[in-house]
Curated annotation (Swiss-Prot):
Listed Gene3D superfamilies: Aldolase class I
This protein's name: Tryptophan synthase alpha chain
This protein's record includes keyword Lyase: yes
Catalytic residues in the record: E34 (proton acceptor), D45 (proton acceptor)
Molecular-function GO terms, alphabetical: tryptophan synthase activity
Superkingdom in the source lineage: Bacteria
Record's function text: The alpha subunit is responsible for the aldol cleavage of indoleglycerol phosphate to indole and glyceraldehyde 3-phosphate.
EC number(s) given by UniProt: 4.2.1.20
Catalytic activity: (1S,2R)-1-C-(indol-3-yl)glycerol 3-phosphate + L-serine = D-glyceraldehyde 3-phosphate + L-tryptophan + H2O
Amino acid sequence: MKGFIAYIPAGFPDLETTRKILIALNELGITGVEIGVPFSDPVADGPVIQLAHSVALRNGVTMKKILEMLGEISVDYDLYLMSYLNPIVNYPEGKEKLLDELKKLGVKGLIIPDLPLREVKNVNIAYPIVPFVAPNTKDEEIEFINSVQAPFVYYISRYGVTGEREDLPFADHIKRVKERIKLPLFVGFGISRHEQVEKVWEIADGAIVGSALVRIMEESPKDEIPKKVVEKVKELLGK
């Protein structure tokens, strides 16, 4: 099995359910989990994940509470924090305190959707930041990625916001990017079926799935959410 990263929105429908999901996913041998930090203006996310953000915010979920929850669990897969820039730079105890806490928790990297590739080195965040590549990313920017320290590169396989799609476009471009970068290449945005995961595995190092899992969470009774998420991930992995 190649790489697989699941996106789980923290605090949807509540942090206790998030904790149970993270523990339940530990049995599947996946590469990692992106922990989504709720934000009031999630511009890169589609309606499914936007709803999860709004529910979590109404429930009073904060960055600090997310870190406390992560401190209560131990998992074998890699943890990544997916957050818009604002909650990071405006952390109440200061950005450096946040980064120190993330390091103690073993978080492998930050995924910041509203941080342009060229700005990564200018925001003064001393932590591995996952760069994004899209079908319209210029060649010189792809070369720039090789100068960035990061756990992997996140390829956005569709223009626009997150959400489930039927096809996997830009396969040729994904292959070209894969040939030119030194870091592992993971493809996300729109993957919802095992067949799509397999197509990604053929041309990249791993797949990232978000909206398909969040939809399962939205459609399931709260006490069944961890089990239903595990079942969906197994389906995506072909297990």
